[in-house]
């Protein structure tokens, strides 16, 4: 890490980011049609209202929308066993992220015969035997699927999964026996509708355990309206972790431990950002907090690469392909341009002979953060006292309270399946 000696973590009280969210305002199922969701537009402290079907009306031509194309995996696996008393005991394994041996995530999803993941286990005390076994059928072939506990650290387990078929992938296994992991505040089992509607229409990169929900509103018709206006569409990947639902339990945000997530950015997008960021009338619009955190993280990873070069060191170490929770603030004294930072990353990728930046980010965007790449954010309405709400406060200041009060008073639906908003930034 590159520490700034004058850096102090923000000590904002999380209580200042609380509001009353009645259960009746939470969306427990999606709107009938994706683009029917309501859209609140915030620009220079003025609130406007529309629907996602008309979102192109609020975005200028030649703007760039950047989407997260991560796909939610069926990460919940149930093992059921009937004991001698004829009582069914259920053990649920919730796959969080693959162990280091099986990263990037694509490698874990395409693994054959064996793979290991960091997992949560529901009913862990019921797990008495060494190995859990489940039978399944894929392509008319009977397969035995095994789960074995390897280790436990801080309430999470390392689970080794294995199966007795040489060509079936872990992705195929999950598609048959796994369940879509709905957010914890949706207190129901996932159904057939969720398999479609808790995915964006453009999701292709398997690995998330929660949907990048800002994109759920974008239907084919919405994409067509964006294209008609020459609004450019680009894609990156952040695999959303279960930590996205973790409330900030500490009294002040500096005491919160931000979760880390994998990001993947193609070299073509880095080239594009280098040439098209900071240009008047060509704003960069992040679709979702995950896209925003990824884009901003790419800038700071470029800063780290530049600092490394200034020290005349040959290669950026592997552990520096991770952005720590507060590193963006520690590095803020370095005022490199977008072109400089993107060039540094391009040089790094070219030196490695790779077409994709794969890294981890813990970036925590809070009030006081200076946005480097993004000009606007499209996002849903977030939980009280959450790190996602802190991002809204970083954009709007105390105006978030006015925005959320307006949404509550005007029957907007909140959280993952709810309505959304478009925030324009004027504090760059």
Features from the language model and the residues they span:
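Surface-exposed, charge/polar-rich loops and edge strands
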Residues: 2-428
């Amino acid at each position: 890490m590159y520490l700034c000696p004058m850096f102090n973590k923000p000590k904002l009280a999380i209580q200042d980011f609380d509001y009353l969210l009645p259960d009746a305002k939470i969306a427990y199922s999606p709107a009938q049609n994706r683009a029917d969701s309501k859209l609140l537009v915030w620009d220079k402290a003025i609130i406007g209202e529309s629907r996602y079907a008309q979102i192109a009306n609020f975005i200028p031509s030649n703007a760039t929308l950047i989407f997260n194309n991560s796909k939610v995996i069926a990460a919940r696996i149930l093992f059921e066993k009937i004991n001698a008393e004829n009582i069914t005991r259920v053990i649920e394994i919730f796959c969080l992220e693959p162990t280091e041996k099986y990263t990037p995530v694509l490698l874990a999803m395409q693994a054959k015969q064996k793979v290991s993941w960091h997992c949560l286990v529901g009913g862990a005390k019921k797990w008495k035997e060494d190995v859990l076994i489940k039978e399944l059928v894929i392509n008319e072939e009977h397969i035995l699927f095994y789960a074995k506990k390897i280790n436990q650290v801080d309430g999470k387990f390392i689970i080794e999964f294995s199966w007795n078929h040489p060509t079936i992938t872990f992705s195929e296994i999950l598609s048959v026996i796994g369940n879509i992991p709905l957010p914890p505040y949706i207190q129901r089992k996932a159904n057939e509708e969720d398999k479609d509607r808790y995915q964006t229409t453009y999701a292709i990169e398997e690995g998330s355990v929660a949907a990048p929900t800002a994109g759920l509103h974008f239907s084919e018709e919405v994409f067509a309206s964006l294209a008609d206006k020459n609004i450019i569409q680009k894609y990156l990947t952040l695999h959303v972790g279960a930590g996205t639902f973790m409330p900030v339990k500490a009294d002040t945000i500096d005491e919160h431990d931000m979760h880390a997530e994998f990001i993947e950015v193609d070299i073509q997008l880095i080239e594009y950002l280098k040439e098209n960021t900071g240009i008047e009338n060509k704003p960069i619009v992040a679709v979702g907090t995950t896209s925003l955190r990824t884009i901003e993280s790419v800038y700071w990873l470029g800063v780290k690469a530049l600092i490394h070069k200034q020290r005349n060191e040959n290669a950026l170490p592997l552990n520096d392909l991770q952005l720590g929770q507060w590193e963006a603030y520690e590095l803020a004294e370095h005022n490199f341009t977008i072109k400089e930072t993107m060039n540094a990353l391009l040089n790094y990728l070219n030196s490695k002979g790779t077409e994709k930046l794969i890294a981890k980010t813990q970036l925590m965007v809070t009030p006081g953060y200076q946005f480097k790449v993004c000009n606007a954010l499209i996002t849903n309405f977030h939980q009280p006292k959450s790190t996602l709400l802190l991002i809204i406060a970083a954009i709007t200041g105390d105006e978030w309270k006015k925005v959320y009060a307006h949404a509550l008073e005007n029957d907007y639906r909140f959280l993952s399946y709810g309505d959304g908003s478009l925030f324009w930034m004027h504090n760059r």
